[in-house]
């Protein structure tokens, strides 16, 4: 990952509108990981990531920034809700399962990359196994010359050509494949996931290496064997070692809803357990060792990004030690009508483009006029102000409502509007949404 902070922000701008402060903070944090890897080994161990706390209302891009960042970094990434965890001793998941899930995500990510690398070798091996099943073994050359062997080779090449052209796809063959019995489902109480995983691994290990003959169509058999060969070509031990390093050096954990475990003033009851979750998170964020399938994982250099709306609580309501472990504070701003307008048109695969392309599959063309987009943005902002502010997610609700009739009758409308597209202008938006937006009681329930 050698992108500069400016390049990272530019890439994030393709998908997320506004929130420049948050983008800059995560871009610097990501670049610092690359800078750290360039340091001498003894100094590298001393440099720890500066964890981030994002503060802002729902639907303004907190989660999306973290998700896009992980994709850019090509790093093991996991998003968790802080409210899903309980302190040790209570029924529920403990916070160490975050790192176990991160380790699983790293293995999955690297395995997909490795399978992609050996794809062509796996295809060749699968092709040979299919041809072996289609053709009898070559006859040993007898007498003078090797005419039968050459003849067999010519036949094989002919079948190979037909196989690649798809002419044999519907032919049925008997082929030996790995015996994968149906997975054993083990129902376990919350907090016992580790034991469940170990039992499932034990049962799957018992059937490893067993083969069985199945009657399959060539196309189906080719896909099955290709996947089997790809898995066989991947070095599992090396994969696990690389996954362990990826988790420790490049892992990113996004903890959402952290404000929900903040202790509010003059509140009692379940808050004891909430504070317990915060205290359990402390060693994880500070740096400790967690036992996973890959072995012992050190969390010292994992980047933690926490986020919360903090409507009913403040960042200062978190326990002081946790505040100290999230040194970078970024405040995300509520969205303005202009932001809504830009969200509808500017990002890569914007909402208007998605709906346009979806309806195009039915042969129906729709066009969003500039005044229509402006009016839609105004309504989204108004409804957010009058009712609950759910940020950009309000646009999904409005667009579904706006295009409900068009989506339902798309096949019929396609023949009527074959010569010109349906225009979504301010008048169209007002006729479908205006009354709902003006009536506060209606918009509270419908929009």
From Swiss-Prot:
Main location: cytoplasm
Subunit structure: A double ring-shaped homohexamer of HslV is capped on each side by a ring-shaped HslU homohexamer. The assembly of the HslU/HslV complex is dependent on binding of ATP.
Species lineage: Bacteria, Pseudomonadati, Pseudomonadota, Gammaproteobacteria, Pseudomonadales
Organism annotation: Pseudomonas aeruginosa (strain LESB58)
Protein name: ATP-dependent protease ATPase subunit HslU
Keyword DNA repair: no
InterPro entries, per the entry: AAA+_ATPase (IPR003593), ATP-dep_Clp_protease_ClpX (IPR050052), ATPase_AAA_core (IPR003959), Clp_ATPase_C (IPR019489), HslU (IPR004491), P-loop_NTPase (IPR027417)
Gene Ontology cellular-component annotations: HslUV protease complex
Record Pfam families: AAA, AAA_2
